[in-house]
Amino acid sequence: MQQIVLASTSPYRKALLEKLTVPFVCASPDIDETPRIGENAIDLVIRLAESKARALATHYTNHLIIGSDQVCVLGNSITGKPHNKINATRQLQQASGKCVSFFTGLALFNSATQSIQSIAEPFDVYFRTLTEAEIDGYLEKEQPWNCAGSFKSEGLGITLFERLSGRDPNTLIGLPLIALTQMLQKEGLNPLTVRNE
């Protein structure tokens, strides 16, 4: 069985991949994540997911390398990680009462055969109307500065929503496990039949 590499140091993605109970290692890809001029959200997350997976191929030459990246879109604007409270407050104010679309790019690169599978998995988040006090309270308690959209859906962020819409809730956290399982199966690796030694 080819070994699996997660091209990420995100504790959230690592925890998600652990759900599949397949052995893997994590490694940090070093890529430029700057969006290209005129690049839409779907093209951006697919390009970044593929770039992250391919970036590790020189060190992992006979592996299945998983790359993932996520952006959120409000209106026609791509919104990234807030990095601080001022930006997070602005993002949540803009999202209040609206639908925010998330796109998670997923790539599985077989470094031995040089074949790659990739998708952009959509997920919609419908925010309820939020008060300033709720936004402040949430940001104070959870400090989601590293999260696209300024929330952690796996934590207190769930209280910000009216409803969620998508085929895989793991997509919102950063790693679409349903799609990943399908990709792994195409490479001959089924998480349900892998023996962990």
Curated annotation (Swiss-Prot):
Keyword Ligase tagged: no
GO BP term, example: nucleotide metabolic process
Compartments reported by the entry: Cytoplasm
Main location: cytoplasm
GO terms, molecular function: nucleoside triphosphate diphosphatase activity
Gene Ontology cellular component list: cytoplasm
EC number: 3.6.1.-
Sites annotated Important for substrate specificity: Y12, Q70, E154
Keywords: Cytoplasm, Hydrolase, Nucleotide metabolism
Pfam families in UniProt: Maf
Function recorded in the entry: Nucleoside triphosphate pyrophosphatase that hydrolyzes 7-methyl-GTP (m(7)GTP). May have a dual role in cell division arrest and in preventing the incorporation of modified nucleotides into cellular nucleic acids.
Similarity-based family: Belongs to the Maf family. YceF subfamily.
Name this protein carries in UniProt: 7-methyl-GTP pyrophosphatase
Organism taxonomic ancestry: Bacteria, Pseudomonadati, Pseudomonadota, Gammaproteobacteria, Enterobacterales
